[in-house]
Amino acid sequence: MAGGFRPYDQDSCPNLTNSEAPEFSMSVVCKTEPHYFHPQTAILPSVQYSHPYHHYLSQFAPNFVPYYYRLLSRPIMKQEEMDIENYINYEVAAQQTMMRQRTLKPLGQLQIQMPPPIIVNQPVKPVPVKAVPVRRSSPPKRRVINAQLVAVATASGGIKNIEPRVEPLPRLEESFKQQVAKIQKSQHHYEQLFGRLTSMLKTLNQRYDNDAEDVPAPPSKRPRHMSTSSSESHIPDTASEKDEKDTLVQYPHRVQKEDGSAVYVLGPNGTQITAHQYGEVFWTNAPVATRCLLCVVFSSDELATHTLTGKPSPAFYGRERPPKLQLDQRKVDDIVVCVRNRTGGKERVIRATITTKCADTAKKYKRRAKKAQKVAIKEEY
């Protein structure tokens, strides 16, 4: 059919082509496009025919009325263009699909995002790798630990027993059994003795460190009633004991010499030390003061080779060692008197401290001797 609708205009087409009279004619001659072409009124390029479109329409369809005749204004005809609404709807649908996929399969937050590949125009040169020669050493030797060969198969397939032949032990003699019994008996005795000594040393150490309370004194022995004819024997000598106590209270006593130096007399036996030595003694408690006075009055050699009583130690019963010498009892008594008057300690605590000090000094000398022997052996090698 013809292109866009144009109202009939007598001015635009005054003459008909093949006939002068306005009658029906089938000859149609296409004319050129006029200069007033409007793109909104035609989809295709408009073509001017010899007769108007409505003239032919009235001839073939006299009762046909186009729908746009009923409108107030004629419709605007546009050429085919891009549908913006469909394009927007397509983009929205694509975004919704992508969000739905992410919701169903969320990406991990800690997923490592790899950077985009770097496009290198130049070819990558391979880095030369130096070949490292592999050292083929001999396999490690097998170590066999605690292996015992029990049997070996012979050439014929039999099993040969190779258990070592152990000679039977000789019969035990009766004298040997008696010696073993004696050793067991003495060992039991030593265990009991060492147990007592360990507890005693522990108690002495606690007393020396003032960690334990004073143990009550052992009960006094029952008085022995001796029958005598003199009635004076039953009267205690209170006067002599009181005079002795008064005499001992004055110690330690400071004495000024003619040359101007001062000395201290520790007890009634006349044991003396200088004022400087007396000032270096710590009088905090009885054990500490006793050890300080022992180091001043006696030398280290005397303390290592002497004991308080000079008797062999019961700890070495059955294997007695040579007994040590006894310390000078006069000096020991002066030390006991001095410490008792200054600290108020008990005599048995002071004497126990003297025994411990002698043992400690002897151990110190033994350790020094062993150390010197080791050094001498190293020098020889």
Curated annotation (Swiss-Prot):
<dbReference type="GO" id="GO:0045746">
    <property type="term" value="P:negative regulation of Notch signaling pathway"/>
</dbReference>
<dbReference type="GO" id="GO:0003682">
    <property type="term" value="F:chromatin binding"/>
</dbReference>
<feature type="region of interest" description="Disordered">
    <location>
        <begin position="210"/>
        <end position="245"/>
    </location>
</feature>
<protein>
    <recommendedName>
        <fullName>Early boundary activity protein 2</fullName>
    </recommendedName>
</protein>
<dbReference type="GO" id="GO:0005634">
    <property type="term" value="C:nucleus"/>
</dbReference>
<dbReference type="GO" id="GO:0033696">
    <property type="term" value="P:heterochromatin boundary formation"/>
</dbReference>
<dbReference type="GO" id="GO:0045666">
    <property type="term" value="P:positive regulation of neuron differentiation"/>
</dbReference>
<dbReference type="GO" id="GO:0043565">
    <property type="term" value="F:sequence-specific DNA binding"/>
</dbReference>
<dbReference type="GO" id="GO:0005677">
    <property type="term" value="C:chromatin silencing complex"/>
</dbReference>
<keyword id="KW-0804">Transcription</keyword>
<dbReference type="Pfam" id="PF10523">
    <property type="entry name" value="BEN"/>
</dbReference>
<dbReference type="GO" id="GO:0006325">
    <property type="term" value="P:chromatin organization"/>
</dbReference>
<keyword id="KW-0678">Repressor</keyword>
<dbReference type="InterPro" id="IPR037496">
    <property type="entry name" value="BEND6-like"/>
</dbReference>
<feature type="domain" description="BEN">
    <location>
        <begin position="268"/>
        <end position="365"/>
    </location>
</feature>
<keyword id="KW-0238">DNA-binding</keyword>
<keyword id="KW-0805">Transcription regulation</keyword>
<dbReference type="GO" id="GO:0003714">
    <property type="term" value="F:transcription corepressor activity"/>
</dbReference>
<dbReference type="GO" id="GO:0005704">
    <property type="term" value="C:polytene chromosome band"/>
</dbReference>
<dbReference type="InterPro" id="IPR018379">
    <property type="entry name" value="BEN_domain"/>
</dbReference>
<dbReference type="GO" id="GO:0045892">
    <property type="term" value="P:negative regulation of DNA-templated transcription"/>
</dbReference>
<comment type="subunit">
    <text>The heterotrimeric Elba complex consists of Elba1, Elba2 and Elba3.</text>
</comment>
<comment type="function">
    <text>The heterotrimeric Elba complex is required for chromatin domain boundary function during early embryogenesis. It binds to a 8-bp sequence 5'-CCAATAAG-3' in the Fab-7 insulator or boundary element in the bithorax complex and contributes to its insulator or boundary activity. Elba2 can act as a transcriptional repressor and binds the palindromic sequence 5'-CCAATTGG-3' to mediate transcriptional repression.</text>
</comment>
<keyword id="KW-0539">Nucleus</keyword>
